[in-house]
């Protein structure tokens, strides 16, 4: 494929599946991680056993200087960035009146500021090259809101706002910007849900099942290769919320 792809938050969950599958399809993948070094190294070793290359890079992309380092590393080594996938994120269940300043700031920094920093730094290279693809991973909660997850919902809604606004601004530079807003996906982030809660959610989903990380990855592939889709919030949720 010969496209250079940065995936943030790529050591676990949806990000790991995205990075792994794109690497298998011969995209040049820079898999970013922050705290989960063990999982990132395991991903690299797993793929190397199949003679598949993947690059890993440690950076806390909620900090401007470390986001810059990741972007500069990629450009210096590979010459360009074709695709940026902003996936890094955290979640927290907490009643609104119990959310502390630290909780709020940590959520906004990790989920929203990281998108701002990574996208702003990457866009400079994409504008110069007159092409690019930016895919943000938001959430259905950013669209409909979630009880006891106000700060999470706000951070994800902000990502969708960036997506729509930036798509208009970057369109003339042939840079496409889209969001994928997953519903409930079977990843570590949702491990806090009980079996009863999962079953209750399934009853609300027309397809009566929880999504898989691979469902998101397939959409990522399509958005990378597409040439005319921009400014869209694509919710992969099994029909939840219809």
Language-model-derived ranges and their functions:
Residues 25-42:
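Conserved glycine-rich Rossmann-like NAD(P)H-binding loop of the short-chain dehydrogenase/reductase
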Residues 131, 209-236, 241:
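C-terminal substrate-recognition "lid" of short-chain dehydrogenase/reductases
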